[in-house]
């Protein structure tokens, strides 16, 4: 995790190699970048994930964080194989312009690959990784464009969660009624 005040000291956020974050950095809002994490497969989707989200909610409340963001990954870099889920994210979950990072121009991979009326929504959502689904359930968005990370064999998308726009029902679930 990297708060905006710490990023200023470091000179940048980690995900700036992949995404132009100027719209977030100039927003005047308190930011928190979430880095890559991995939870052992035996604990994914269970109580461990709930406790991680709950601890994060406490940190967000303690530091008055307004916008959380970070990179999440699909396995693989074959864009054609990811066309449905990427297109679904672009068409249904694109961040509002005032908080929408964009993949760096020199590495920009469009996510708008399939016309919206040709997307198999069920199949596309099944292909979306659980972490991305969790952000979407909370009211999260994706930035514009993806980044093909050949070193890690992933296709990365930028996730953005504006705490003021969070889904109230799921906010209560993940925060145990913490004041977010």
Positions of predicted regions on the chain:
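Acyl-donor binding region in acyl/amide transferases
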Residues: 3-141, 146-155, 159, 166
